[in-house]
Amino acid sequence: MNQTAGPELARSRRLLTGYFAGLGVVMAVWGARMPAVQNTAELSTAGLALVLLAAALGMVAGLQTGGRLARPACLPTLLTGGAIALAVCLAVLGVCRSLESLLVAAFVFGAAHGVLDVAVNAAAVRCQDAHGRPIMGRLHASFSLGGLTGAALTSATAHTPHTVLFAGVAATAATAAGAATRLTRCLASPGLEPVHNRVAPGLDERGGLSRPRLWLLGTLAAGTLLGEGAAADWAAVHLHDLGATAATSAVAYGVYSAAMAAGRLAGDRLTARFGAPAVVRAGAALAALGLATGLAGSTIAFALLGWAAFGLGLSVTIPSLITAAGIGGPRAVATVAVTGYVGLLAGPALIGAVATVIALPHALLLPALLAAAVAALAPKALEKPTP
């Protein structure tokens, strides 16, 4: 890193930290107030499922579009435009009163989320390359901390109409994105060029990721995000089935999220010292063993420890996979993200279907088994680049 790039690099890192945190807040507020959206629009369970499907389809479209557009010169526009569009859509979702309007708004919301997701991760890869050391974990930790902040905000405003909350969060996010417009230009600066050109095992003759390695990264992302989806949708149910109160059950996902944030904050130093393959392998093994142990126990304390170990163990996986995909450029990042979100979206439903046949703790062994698979395959997927 040259001296002239230092200030630009610091500004870029702070800016991306804010973007990741803001995205975490928006998504947490939207998810936590979804029941209010359902009640206000008088949606059936099937209707809500259609709204979520529209958001998912929009996100896939946004990820693909963002992957095509996320060149360095376009990053400032994609970040500012994506953030403002996401904020406006959140406010619109708050005032929708029919299934039809919600479907349209949810699709555009998902598309804006997808574009912003690719742009912020592509910018993070670029910033990390220029930095010459791992910073992806801390950036993703800010998303986790933003999610916790959003959850706390939602809890504190439980008696506030969701329309008012959505409008307030949207106005804050849009104002912040607009105010940071000039700052985003530093992300396209030549000062953020990589400190070295990386040629990794698994690159094709054109310098991009080979298809087998790209799909391996995507498959590991899907397995990891299936586990994240399971924690979000089933951790509280698991504790409730063990006899926990509603308040204690709600703590389960908070424990998981806090452990993941802590792991990501420490993950960069561990990755710099031991390398991504070793750290991801050890973390995924901890996740598999911890969750399996928590499921085997019959006490609430065991279950909470299990979910904490699961979050801590998986914390470094997605940042490391995004970093590895970044070698192939924004389209590779988008491909891994799209594949990963298949696991996030389909996983909870799959676990629910399995739980209708066998006990829920047995069904929740699926994320533990997938974490074990991540531990086994991480060294191959995350081979260290060689000059």
Q: Model-derived features: where do they sit?
A:
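Intracellular juxtamembrane helix-capping segments at the cytosolic ends
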Residues: 115-130, 315-328
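Helix-breaking motifs and short loop linkers at transmembrane-helix boundaries and internal kinks
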Residues: 42, 74, 95-100, 275, ...
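Structural signature of the two symmetry-related core transmembrane helices
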Residues: 77-91, 100, 278-293
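Pair of pore-lining "gating" transmembrane helices in MFS-fold secondary transporters
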Residues: 6-33, 107, 211-227, 304, ...
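Short amphipathic helix-loop junctions that connect adjacent transmembrane helices
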Residues: 32-46, 233-248
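Helix-to-loop junctions at the C-terminal end of transmembrane segments
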Residues: 60-75, 158, 263-276, 355
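Interfacial helix-cap and linker-helix signal at transmembrane-aqueous boundaries
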Residues: 37-38, 69-70, 153-159, 239-240, ...
